[in-house]
Amino acid sequence: MPLAKRIIPCLDVDNGRVVKGVKFLDIRDAGDPVEIAKRYNQEGADEITFLDITATHEGRDTTVHTVEKIASEVFIPLTVGGGIRTVDDIRTMLNAGADKVSINSAAVFNPDFVKAASDRFGAQCIVVAIDAKKVSAEGEMPRWEIFTHGGRKPTGIDAVEWAVKMAGYGAGEILLTSMDGDGTKKGYDLGVTRAISDAVPIPVIASGGVGNLQHLVDGVTLGRADAVLAASIFHFREYTLPQAKEFMRAQGIEVRL
């Protein structure tokens, strides 16, 4: 029996509020993270991802208090990211109730951090987040580059090669966000999603650009992702999680109803 594909709502949290932007900019308010997380838990989300989108840029730590409140209300796996830079940061988040942590910029600056974190806490706890942007011109071999600091700083690192390296360093999962797609509602970048899914032996979560339920299906079928992440379509009630799961199941995709 195939493993069920997961649907993961993402809470981008800025100063204690859930927000949503377009291509990492133009932020609009979506509500209180604890209330939103509770709703998704009740609606049947498979997991929830909480990303403190200001943490790395402003050099402050993720709001432990909010994580504790969400963890006390939510009974599905919770991944927390944003400003995770040390083994102590990871321990703090796991103690606050997170099941996994997402490491982004810190992995780029110090890949051995991922290895140390995986050795200490287990690969199942460690998600490496990749913000990728297409840098090849039309007609060229497709190539995607890693950006850090909330998508503000280019690194020159090839996204597919980086994903393979991170899997080798002990990441348990890759959270792949297409910066070209983020918030645009035009669908995932299926090219980079498929390239990374095919290249690594660990699950890949597709993120960035969902505008309708067919995009979730495409992420799994065409992008070959193991899980699909979305934000605004759920936050602003364009669709509900049960609708998303029924739609995917109707297309022959195994999901937990």
Swiss-Prot record:
Subunit structure: Heterodimer of HisH and HisF.
Native source organism of the sequence: Cellvibrio japonicus (strain Ueda107)
Keyword Disulfide bond appears in the UniProt entry: no
Entry EC no(s): 4.3.2.10
GO molecular function: imidazoleglycerol-phosphate synthase activity; lyase activity
GO biological process: L-histidine biosynthetic process
CDD domains in alphabetical order: HisF
Pathway: Amino-acid biosynthesis; L-histidine biosynthesis; L-histidine from 5-phospho-alpha-D-ribose 1-diphosphate: step 5/9
UniProt subcellular location: Cytoplasm
Protein family per UniProt: Belongs to the HisA/HisF family.
Protein known as: Imidazole glycerol phosphate synthase subunit HisF
Chemical reaction(s) catalysed: 5-[(5-phospho-1-deoxy-D-ribulos-1-ylimino)methylamino]-1-(5-phospho-beta-D-ribosyl)imidazole-4-carboxamide + L-glutamine = D-erythro-1-(imidazol-4-yl)glycerol 3-phosphate + 5-amino-1-(5-phospho-beta-D-ribosyl)imidazole-4-carboxamide + L-glutamate + H(+)
Gene Ontology cellular-component annotations: cytoplasm
